[in-house]
Amino acid sequence: MGNVARRWLPLALIAAVTALTAYVIRDLPNPVAIDLRGLLPFSLEPAADTAPRWVAIVAMPALATVVWILFAALRSRLALGLTRRLYGDMPEALGNPVTVTRFRPTYDTIVLWVVTLVLGIHTGVVAAALGHVTLAPRIISVVLGMSLVAMGNVFPRLRPNLVAGIRTRRTLADPLLWRSTHRIMGVALVLAGLMTVLVGLVAPSFGLPTAIISLLVTCVIAAVGGSRSAVTSRA
């Protein structure tokens, strides 16, 4: 996929999903009833909620648009400069947008899948509104898992920057630690995503908890494994 196409694909997806949503729920009563009981392995109270039809159509696509705009703003010189101040005595070069531009295709891929995740949640909510109570958690879990796999696949390509990745003072100051941490994080994210997809298909109510727990474990594995790998490489 070309860089320009990848850059604008999130907005095209948002527009397409919004239009499709407006079409498929046009005949539903207003307000729309949304039942997400199958999303978790325990019961939610109330069992179902309602929302105005226009909210069901535009709320999550609007959030996806805000996410896309935020990612675009975060790589600006102003945002990077302000972020660098939060880290104290980090190199001034990290405030340069070039630090993001050099892995721009990877950055755009991550943005695309974050937007896809938001739209996947939206699709699950729409499915619940249409009465597909058991399908909704499967959609959300599968899209969440696929997003983790896709982002994990490109995570090792990230380079030290202030926008994307595991950005601590240690990883930003040590290129070797950055590489080892993100290599391990990428593998762990792929495994977490595959597990989330599998659980989401077989036992959909456990898909979201599986994703949350596996993400926490992934962060621990990346932090510990990355540090040990960096030490071993220096030995």
Regions found by a protein language model. Give the residues of each.
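Alpha-helical transmembrane segments
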Residues: D49-W68, T134-M151, I213-S214
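Active-site and channel-lining beta-strand-loop segments
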Residues: Y23-V58, A164-A173
